[in-house]
Design a protein with these regions (language model features):
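Short, conserved catalytic/metal-binding motifs centered on acidic residues
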Residues: 35, 89, 130, 164-169, ...
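RNase H-like nuclease fold core
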Residues: 143, 147-222, 227-232
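Helix-loop elements that line ligand-binding/catalytic pockets
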Residues: 276-358
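Short, conserved DNA-binding cores of transcription-related domains
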Residues: 1-100
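Acidic, glycine-enriched active-site microenvironments
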Residues: 107-115, 193, 340, 356-357, ...
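Conserved beta-strand -> loop -> alpha-helix junction used to position metal-binding or nucleic-acid-contacting
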Residues: 224, 234-278, 391
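Basic, amphipathic alpha-helical segments enriched in Lys/Arg and hydrophobic/aromatic residues
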Residues: 122, 353-430
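Extended interfacial segments that mediate partner engagement and assembly in macromolecular machines
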Residues: 75, 80-85, 93-169, 176
């Protein structure tokens, strides 16, 4: 049976001995556990002048008493009344205090509590909730966040990865631009850095801190269709291929198909209400790929008197308006070519679509695709490099803002994002 209080509490630190259990006492209006301990040893040299401790040159010089917060024990805050040994150096006639890895000098919170604080800061939890769970003040948690965040900052001497992904997100009101900038490694999905402004001149000033040799090593950059990103990459990453994110291409096509449906639907709003209701109810089927529509199984559908299959229902809706039909067919032909990674077929469809009576919105999208065709070709060559990882990171950023009820200061927000993404890395990324 073990009767050593230090071993029972799991404190295995050299030279630190817990001597007594003082029991429960009220501290800050809460019942807390109190222990008494002592820290002493024989120093090998003076910490002030560095002289070796020969012939009793350094002698013991009393104790300094401090209350060290140990964290929660049995769901109660625990404190250690620690007596730290003081030493006197006869050579320099100065005094110094004994030190231990259990607690930092001139600090009253143990390193175990700080490690737990770091772990909780890496989770999507508000700082106030972390402080409450550890029985410390929110300002203590915030100070610790600032200290730990220094270890995850990006510096100009860092090596840029070969594959990058750029994106933006809405951060805080104290930034100058409307959106903030974030970029990550497309392969490992690790955040590299977060900037307060996505405007081109700000990004140029930032990336010019990296040497040209580092920037030339970048092979691909995945982006959405934001024109300043394209100009920036061409200027600063001369050997990098620009990849238009596949999701944004699909989203642009689907959005215009849906907009055309809404325009046609609103035309039937006062004239033919049944057609309006059908277009409104079955909008999802118009966005579904034609090859995935069921043609064999007929069943009753609301608003239809006769049984329909998914395919026949869609054909009925398309026959209501010729523009809707052309927009639907052209849009899904583009999506099919994109899914098959057939660049020649995509080029043919884009040229052929110029003669089709599609909606104005889809014509604008087609014009944009023709303009960005070299970058869309890169999208098809690098089918596994997308902005998907960084879009997932942006979803987590929104979750952090929601849980924390927003942030006022951009740098505090940035530090928290980097803490959550960089402090503890998954095993498969190591």
């Amino acid at each position: 049976m073990c009767n050593d209080i230090s071993e029972i509490l799991g404190i295995k630190v050299k030279n630190l001995k817990i001597t007594q259990n003082l029991g429960l006492h009220v501290h800050k209006n809460v019942q807390a556990l109190f222990y008494e301990g002592q820290l002493t040893y024989h120093p090998s040299a003076c910490e002030c002048c560095g002289i070796k401790n020969d012939n009793h040159l350094i002698i013991k010089h009393g104790f300094r008493k401090t209350n060290v917060y140990m964290g929660l024990i049995f769901e109660r805050p625990a404190y250690l009344k620690l007596k730290k040994q003081r030493f006197y150096c006869k050579a320099c006639q100065r005094t110094f205090t004994a030190e231990t890895p259990y607690i930092q000098p001139r600090c009253t919170i143990s390193n175990e509590v700080k490690r737990m604080m770091t772990w909780k800061l890496s989770k999507v939890t508000s700082e106030k909730d972390i402080a409450e769970s550890l029985c410390v003040s929110p300002s203590t948690v915030h100070r610790h966040l600032k200290v730990v965040s220094n270890s995850v900052k990006t510096h100009a001497h860092y090596v840029l990865p070969e594959h990058l992904a750029f994106d933006e997100f809405k951060s805080t009101k104290d930034v100058e631009g409307a959106m903030s900038f974030i970029y990550c490694d497309s392969v490992t999905h690790d955040i590299i850095d977060i900037l307060p402004d996505r405007r081109k001149h700000q990004l140029e000033a930032y990336f010019l801190k990296f040497s040209r040799k580092q920037r030339e090593k970048v092979k691909t950059v995945s982006i959405d269709m934001f024109p300043p990103y394209i100009a920036l990459i061409q200027d600063l990453f001369p050997d990098a291929e620009i990849i238009i994110d596949r999701f944004h291409i699909v989203q642009a096509i689907n959005r215009e198909i849906n907009r055309c449906r809404v325009q046609v639907m609103n035309g039937f709003r006062t004239k033919e209400r049944p057609q309006y209701n059908k277009l409104k109810r079955y909008w999802k089927l118009l966005l579904k790929a034609p090859i995935d529509l069921d043609r064999m199984i007929y069943q009753p559908y609301r608003l239809f008197k006769s049984w329909q299959s998914q395919y026949s229902l869609v054909q009925y809706l398309l026959n209501l308006d010729e523009t809707l039909k052309e927009t639907y067919e052209t849009g899904h032909r583009l999506l099919s070519a994109l899914k098959a990674n057939d660049i020649q077929q995509l080029r043919f469809i884009l040229q052929d679509a110029k003669t089709k009576d599609t909606s104005k919105g889809l014509k604008r999208v087609i014009h944009t695709f023709i303009k960005y065709m070299p970058y869309i070709s890169s999208t098809m060559r690098h089918r596994h490099l997308t902005n998907g990882p960084i879009e997932g990171i942006n979803n987590k950023i929104k979750l952090i803002k929601r849980v924390s009820y927003g942030y006022r200061n951009f740098w505090n927000f940035r530090n928290r994002i980097l803490m959550i993404s960089k402090v503890f890395v998954s095993e498969y990324k190591k």
